[in-house]
Amino acid sequence: MKNVKKGKRKKSDKPQFGLISKILLTINILVVVLYLTACYIGYVDPDSASYLALMPMAYPLFLIATIPTLLFWVVKHRRLMLITVCSWLATIPQICAFMPIHFNDIEQAQSEKGSYTLTTYNTYGFAGDKETKNAIIDEILEKNADFVCIQEATTIDDLRYWHTDPDRIARLCARYPYVHFSNKNHTLGCFSKRPIGIIMEQSIGNYFYVEAYKTSGLGGEIYIINTHMESIGLTVDDKRLYMDLTQTAKKETLKGVRSHLLNKLLRADRQRAVQARLIKSIADSLRTASPHTPLFICGDFNDPPYTYSYLTAKGNYSDAYTDAGVGYAHTYNRNRFYFRIDNIFYDDRLVEAEACRVGTSKASDHHSVTATFNNHNK
C-alpha cells in the first residue's frame, strides 16, 4: 500500500482580512456615506432635508475623517483605497471649493489694463474703538478695489461723529467719490470710483437686505448685486454654548445644548433658502433684460459652499474664490465659526476671475474678499 503524503496547505499571498480590518471597513463606508451626503445634500431644499441640510457646515471634518482609513488601506488592503478615492473623485468640485489651488498675483492682476476689482466686506458696523474703525478703513484702502460692497455698513457722517481719523476718512472719500448707503439702518452700502445707479433695494425682516447697482467697468456697463442674508440665528449666549460644546461639556447637558443649537441653525437655514431664491430671481431678471452685461453677486451669505442657499444664490454663476483663490480660507473669524461665508459670484460667460484673495485683518468679525476680473477677449 502506497503512502500518500499530505501536501502542505499553501499560505495565501493575500493579507488576512481580520476583525480590525472589518471594523475599519464598516467605519470607512459609514464615513464615506456621511461625506457624500455633506457634499450633495445642498441640492435638496432644507424644508425636505431637515437637519441633514446642516451637514455641509461640517464638510471639512467629514473630508478629514476619510483620510485615516485611506492610510490604513495603503498598508493593508490597497484595493479598498478605492472606496475613499472614488468618493474624492465624485466630489472634485466640493474639494476645489474648499481648497482651491491657483498661484496668481492679485496685485499684478489689478495692474492689467481693463481689469476690474471688487471687494465685499462685512464691516460689523465699524463697531469697536477708534483704532478698530481706522483699521477697517485701512483694509478698504489697501485692497484698492474699483467697487466695494459693504454689509453692516455705517455712514461717513457717523464715522466723523465717532472721531475716526479724519485723514483716513478724507483718503477714503477721495479714493471713492461715489458712495451709497441703504435707507434702512444703513445695513448695505458701497464705495465706487465710478458713478453708481441704484436699480433696486429690498429687505425682509431685520437681517436680509439686497440691493442691485449699475456702474461701469470692463469696457462697458456692469451690474452688481450686494446682499446680507439671514445670520446663522445664534445669539451671543448661543455662541458661548457652542464654544463650550467645542471644548468640554457635561454629558447630561450635551444633548440639550446640541438640540437647542441645531433647531436655531435649521430655522435660519430655511429662511436663507427663501432669500437665496429671491436673489436668484433678481439676478435672472437682470440677465434676461441685458444678457451681454457682466453681473456680479457679492455679500455675506452666512452659509458655506455647497449649502442650499449658496448653490441657489450662485445659480449658473461661478465662485471667484473657487476659480482664482488659493488654499483653505475662512471669512468669519469669531466664536470658532471658521467658515467661508462671504462670496463674489460672477458670470463666466463674459468675464474671467484673474485672482481672488481673502483678507487677514481682524478689525471686523469678517475678513474681506477681493477679486480681480477681466474680459475673456482681453
Model-predicted segments: where are they?
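Metal-dependent phosphoester-hydrolase catalytic domains
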Residues: 5, 20-35, 40-52, 56-74, ...
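A solvent-exposed, charged loop/short amphipathic helix patch at secondary-structure junctions
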Residues: 239-265
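Active-site charged/polar residues at nucleotide-handling catalytic sites that mediate phosphoryl
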Residues: 143
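Active-site metal-binding loops of divalent metal-dependent hydrolases
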Residues: 121-123, 153, 229, 300-301, ...
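Transmembrane alpha-helices and immediately adjacent membrane-cytoplasm interface residues
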Residues: 63-107
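N-terminal Lys/Arg-rich, disordered targeting/topogenic segments
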Residues: 1-18
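Structured beta-strand-rich core segments of catalytic domains in phosphoester-bond hydrolases
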Residues: 88-112, 125, 147, 151-245, ...
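Residue-level marker for buried hydrophobic side chains located in beta-strands
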Residues: 118-119, 149, 297
